[in-house]
Amino acid sequence: MAIVHFVNYKRGTQSHAAMRGVMLYVMQEKKTAWEGKPLVSGINCQPQSAYDDFLNTKLLYHKDGGVMFYHMVQSFPKGAAVDPRQAHEAARRLAEYFGGCDVLVCTHVDREHIHSHCVINSVNFETGKKLHMAKEQIQELMRRNDAICQEMGLPVFEVTAQQARGMSGAEYHTALKGQSWKLRLMNTIDECMKDAADRDAFVCILYLTTCAPLCIR
């Protein structure tokens, strides 16, 4: 089954620019294009106007601060026989858990493992309440993820201890062997600078690209 994890942004790094930067990053056509069409959609919002939709909800309820968004990733194992369109549908079904919230859903097919990014508005447009992911909500989300994968007949795989606990940024960079890490780092920084509108967005995108997130299964 798929692994669900949340990108753990450091306190104080979320802003309007950071939210826009993350959206632009996950929506990139070079990452989402499959058979001539991007695997990008929205729950309660349109992908093209997702940033404005998120912001309008926040301004309506005067909750334009603190945690701006949650960033959930649903990943399938390397080499798994998963149709990208099925993976996108699985992510959409999981995103429906956040009823009343705008969710941008983007499936990336440019890596050896197919994965979907779900950017979730932290403010519910129906109630005006802020979303809080407590332990109970996370457990319910995990059960729903498993149920969706079973219903759709998606492959099951074992989660290793390393995958379950995730990797810190330091561990990630230590794992890069030889001299190639310097070139990889320079290329990564160049790509992040292209996608970022300002410093805040650059920091968020660089963190997203290089640091392994907190994994929850």
State the predicted function of each range.
Residues M1-R217:
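N-terminal nicking endonuclease/strand-transfer module with a His-rich metal-binding environment
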